[in-house]
Amino acid sequence: MNKLFLLLAALSCLILSSPASSKTADLPFSVTTVAELDEPWAMTFLPDGQLLVTEKAGQLLLVSQSGEISKPFSGLPEIAYGGQGGLGDIVLHPNYSSNRLIYISYAESGEGNQYGAAVARAILNFDDKQQGVLENLEVIWRQSPKVSGKGHYGHRMAFDDQGFLFISSGERQKFDPAQDMTGNLGKIIRLHDDGSIPDDNPFFKEGGVTAQIWSSGHRNPLGLAFDDQGRLWNTEMGPLHGDELNLVKRAKNYGYPTVSNGDHYSGKKIPDHDTRPDFEAPKTWWKPTIAPAELIYYSGDMFVDWRNSFLIAGLKPKAIIRVVIDDESAKEVERFDMGVRIREIEQGPDGAVWVLEDGTEAKLLKLTR
């Protein structure tokens, strides 16, 4: 009897320590809980299949595919944690395998009670105890100007196939900066990998931060992804409704706050996009809101029917939204109810889809077939 009890206890511990997998009748995929994290914000895969995961309060972690979580890395900059601010996105340099460069975005403090987003790059190494450390960290970009408040940082990043770095910069809940070309708030930014400004940027001759700008008129762009044609798309939170999926084009103005398919939270109306055809309109938009966070363009083999689709992390509906594109048109075709706010979504090396829940006690999920 004692041997049987010990055997059952051992099996019980094994089950509890292994990733938990489930499949519901409502979802066309299996969901495996890999790990639990505290306010995770972004993740990216290393060449060996492990994940780098950021937590908003300022921790950078290594997570194995079996759910083992490292101690927090050292060498990070000072993070201004609070409101919507903290440690944000993380991406690898396109030549990471040879240069070991990673890029992080985060909120930082300025003078007084002013804040702004920043992007830094560093060499990722591991010490003799296999503890992660960021070395030779350098800040390559900052929001300008820094302003009061702790919202709408944006600060998503994506490299294109030519090695240019694109950064989404929110308008910091100040409305008008999105149309102010003397600052880089409410813009999509295009830089070289070292933070220098390409001389073929549309406003390069204007100099200063204006030279960084690729497109303008953005509100709170929380997702950036390239499709299989190399075109850049972004998800963008509208005001009261009017969330957007935009095809981001060189030198185009996306209209906020002059136009939006949403309205101000005060109830004050904003003219719709169709009233101002001189601004670039979204390819699709949502009312009611989906509060879109990150998006990916799916190209894997595991979910063949999802190819040519964007998968969007939906905070408000607690769902993953699938959008199909056809040339320059876009249409939502499916919505998968996850039952919890979704902050981040990435495609794994084997075509599985990995998801980060939002908030404290948030799960890292792996979706498979």
Regions found by a protein language model. Give the residues of each.
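Positively charged n-region of N-terminal signal peptides that target proteins for export
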Residues: 1-4, 369
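Bacterial N-terminal signal peptides
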Residues: 6-15
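Acidic, Gly/Ser/Thr-rich repeat motifs that build Ca2+-stabilized beta-propeller blades
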Residues: 20-175, 231-234, 238, 288-325, ...
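Surface-exposed loop and turn segments in beta-propeller and other repeat-based domains
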Residues: 73-85, 136-152, 194-214, 257-286
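Beta-propeller blade signature
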Residues: 117-127, 181-194, 248
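Repeat-solenoid scaffold signature
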Residues: 209-249
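Active-site Gly/Thr loop motif
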Residues: 219, 264-275, 290-291, 319, ...
